[in-house]
Each structure stands twice: as C-alpha cells, then as structure tokens.
Amino acid sequence: MMEFILSHVEKGVMTLTLNRPERLNSFNDEMHAQLAECLKQVERDDTIRCLLLTGAGRGFCAGQDLNDRNVDPTGPAPDLGMSVERFYHPLIRRLAKLPKPVICAVNGVAAGAGATLALGCDIVIAARSAKFVMAFSKLGLVPDCGGTWLLPRVAGRARAMGLALLGNQLSAEQAHEWGMIWQVVDDETLADTAQQLARHLATQPTFGLGLIKQAINSAETNTLDTQLDLERDYQRLAGRSADYREGVSAFLAKRSPQFTGK
C-alpha cells in the first residue's frame, strides 16, 4: 500500500507530510484514511505536543483529486455532500479540537480544500512562492473544508467574498499582508523555520496552549459575557496544572522552566 501520509515523530513534534507529489498532494479516499489514523496517534500520545503539517514536492495540496471521484459529466450527479461529510468535516473538526498547536508549512500551491485546510491550522507559515487558490467557484462548487466559516474570519467579509467568487490566486505575501497567515519565509528556509517553531511549542505548557486555542476559537461566536465566563473557567483549570506550578517556580528561582505539558 502506498504511503500517502509520511509520519515522523521527533522531539515532541509529529510531522505529517502529504505524499502524493505527482498529483500535487490532492486527496483521495486512501489518503484521507491514512491521515485520520495519524491524527488518532496525535490525539492519544501525550509525548506528541505539537503537530506540523506540510506537503511533499512542489505543492502543499491541490484539494480533492477529481480523477479519484470518476465523475461522468453525462452520468448521474455524484453526492458531493456525502464526500464532504465523510472526509473533510471530521478532519477540520479534529484539527480544531486538538488540544495541541497545529502548524502548517505551505510549500507551493494550496488550492481548494488544500487552501482551507492550511488556513484552518493554528499557525501558518508559507514559502514566498506559495499560492492560495479558492478554486471551488471555477467548478461551480461552494468552498468546503470549513472555507465559508473560515474565510470571513481570517480575511474579512469583503476579501472572503472576492476570494470565493473569483477563485483567483492569492500570493503568500498578500495573504500575510491581509493577516491571513503568520509568516512568509524564503522557500529554502521553510522546512527549518517550521520545525524550529514546532519544536519550541513542543517544549511549552501544552495543556495551557490547548486552553488558549479553544478559548480563541470559541471567541468567534461567543458574546463578551460568555467569553469572560469561559476565561474564568479555563484559568481555573490552568491554575491547577503542573506546568503552572513549574512556571511560577522557575520564575521565582530565575531559571528556565521545564514544562511537561500537563
């Protein structure tokens, strides 16, 4: 069986590489299944404290492999909603709920579901040559993989509407200028920059980082009062963590903290 997802764990970081470079790492059913299995390991293994997602070859991900669907323009219409519900929705939900930082290193093109997958990660670093393409409208489709929820939040309504309706390429530099991604780096430094950041996050108070992630995600739909209540509850949990005690002890002793992620 082909390895469509390459998995490597080192220094608390799991690096998952989308590995169908001949198809620009576009998704097929088996690739989805392999990625789901890898995410199970991230969820269950407390020694993995950061997830890094990237692509092999000259692109990050071109979205869904249309050849894999065997669509016959003259035949019965496929149920694309079922495909989205079966594969993409669980993926996006799992990444959003994962109580660990998720970094995406975007090399080359990120198109369709590949673009929304990348932008849905917690921190996005892109190579200078990277391009984001909301290609759905070119096929008469609706942005999926969380795209219609995500785009207005990372780009604002006007830009989200333009990106979705026009389906034009968006450069990494422009995405950074619009605040959609964290950082743009030279192509040759992308892998090292992303790994360095992932390894740093893997040494930090993972439990607290997970609470931060969930709080910020919840703020998108919460009222101020609801969010204040959530901050209170999460701060209570964080204050009971071993990492909080270690952080305070290290501060008072003027030494570097040794967080365990708990």
PLM features per residue range, with description:
Residues 55-94, 110, 223:
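Glycine- (often His-adjacent) and acidic-residue-rich active-site loop
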Residues 213-222:
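Short, charged, surface-exposed hinge/linker loops at domain edges
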Residues 49, 206-213, 257-262:
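C-terminal capping/lid region of NAD(P)-dependent oxidoreductase domains
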Residues 2-3, 249-262:
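Terminal low-complexity tails and localization/encapsulation signals of metabolic enzymes
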Residues 93-209, 232, 236-241, 246-249, ...:
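Crotonase-fold acyl-CoA enzyme core
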Residues 1-56, 93:
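Conserved CoA-thioester-binding segment of acyl-CoA-metabolizing enzymes
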